[in-house]
Design a protein with these regions (language model features):
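Glycine-rich beta-alpha loop elements in corrinoid/cobalamin-binding modules
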Residues: 1-20
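Radical SAM [4Fe-4S] cluster-binding motif and immediate context
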Residues: 24-196
Length: 197
């Protein structure tokens, strides 16, 4: 008889706080630190903790699998949940820097600022190597970038993907007006952050 394949429907994990934390104690973290596996180009330390605060992305860029993998609704862990992971692992592994690998770390300013309040107390440098959407919160972008910098963010990656508006509009469906890129770069630099695009 022919084989039958059943593909179950995808389900999103709605409450990220219910997910177990990464079991870093089971991994040879010293080996990763030694080879610089978690570093961005301008890392302040080779002892980097990679963290994800959220899942999902409302954008529909043709090259990206995030909406298919995590869904289009952005779901955040609570600051308390993030704090528990970071506090424990910073101490356990003598961490010198935190890198947030979220696809849309800046989409929700309330959650971002709550995270910044906590990170300011931690006192470690941090960055966003995966990229942040350039045109979120344009009217309050200066305030947002300054808050990030004040809490220890030394480098922001702006996800431009292309310097050609036709490519952005017609090939990769990246909803981005290139006219917003240079002002965003200037705002981030004025806040004291390095900028990667």
């Amino acid at each position: 008889s022919p084989k039958k394949y059943i593909i179950n429907p995808k389900s999103e994990k709605h409450d990220l706080n219910l997910l177990p934390r990464p079991a870093r104690h089971l991994v040879n973290m010293e080996g990763y630190f030694k080879i610089g596996a978690f570093q961005s180009a301008k890392a302040r330390s080779n002892r980097v903790l990679s963290v994800m605060c959220s899942r999902g992305c409302p954008e529909k860029c043709t090259f990206c699998t995030t909406p298919q993998m995590w869904g289009s609704n952005v779901r955040w862990r609570t600051t308390e949940n993030i704090k528990a992971e970071v506090s424990e692992d910073v101490k356990a592994f003598n961490i010198g820097e935190i890198q947030f690998l979220d696809d849309t770390l800046t989409v929700n300013k309330k959650n971002l600022f709550s995270l910044c309040d906590y990170l300011e107390k931690v006192g470690l440098p941090w960055c966003t190597p995966n990229g942040t959407k350039v045109n979120y919160h344009l009217r309050t972008q200066s305030e947002m970038y300054q808050r990030m910098a004040d809490s220890g963010c030394y480098q922001i990656t702006l996800a431009c993907e292309s310097g050609n508006q036709r490519v952005l509009d017609n090939l990769i469906n990246k909803r981005l007006d290139l006219e917003s890129v240079y002002p965003a770069i200037e705002r981030a630099k004025k806040a004291g952050m390095l900028v990667h695009t």
